Each structure stands twice: as C-alpha cells, then as structure tokens.
C-alpha cells in the first residue's frame, strides 16, 4: 500500500470555528520532517493513531484544508469531521483521494 504524507492531529482539539489548530507537538514535528510550509488552501492528510477490534493499528485519517486564523495568528485545518475514518474503512475512491493508492 502506498502511503501519503500523514500529519499528526489531535482530533479532540478544535477552535471556535470548528477547525483543527495546527499547534500540537506531533503536528509541528511531522510538518518539519516533511519540509511542509503551510499556506492558505493547501490540502493535507491528517491522522490520529487508533486500533481495530483486534488491537491492530488502524489509524483514523481525514483530509483538511489549511486556513490562516488571523485572530490567533496561526494555521488551522478545516476538516469535515464526519469524514474521519479508519484506514481499513476507506472506500477505493477515498483511498485514491487521500493518496493511499
């Protein structure tokens, strides 16, 4: 399976506009390790570690669109929260869209 660049996200954090602020240490680390310079409108794939019912790793993933939060002077990802899925549950179309195929 081809793997896209995955950026860590703590899906429990969101700002007043229901966006994911890109401030977690894991997020900052992944952005730096992949030499990603954030910009408005950029699309990235975010993940959070998860497991299936047998204890096997099966991360949660979702696409986010980068926006600059002018009030807090930081970047945030606009995520469709209902689209968060375990990798094993992605349809073929979703796998292609997120870069897994």
What is each model feature region?
Residues 3, 59-61, 67-101:
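Glycine- and charge-enriched low-complexity intrinsically disordered segments
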Residues 9, 63-64:
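Small-residue-enriched segments and motifs
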Residues 23-36:
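Short alpha-helix capping/helix-loop boundary micro-motifs
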Residues 6-26:
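Short, basic/aromatic beta-hairpin or loop at an interaction surface
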């Amino acid at each position: 399976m081809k793997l896209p660049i995955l950026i860590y996200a703590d899906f429990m954090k969101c700002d007043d506009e229901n966006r994911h602020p890109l401030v977690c240490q894991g997020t900052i680390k992944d952005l730096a390790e992949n030499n990603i310079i954030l910009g408005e409108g950029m699309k990235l794939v975010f993940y959070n570690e998860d497991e299936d019912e047998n204890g096997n790793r099966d991360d949660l993933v979702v696409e986010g669109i980068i926006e600059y939060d002018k009030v807090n002077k930081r970047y945030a990802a606009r995520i469709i929260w209902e689209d968060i899925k375990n990798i094993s549950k992605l349809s073929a179309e979703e796998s292609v869209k997120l870069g897994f195929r």
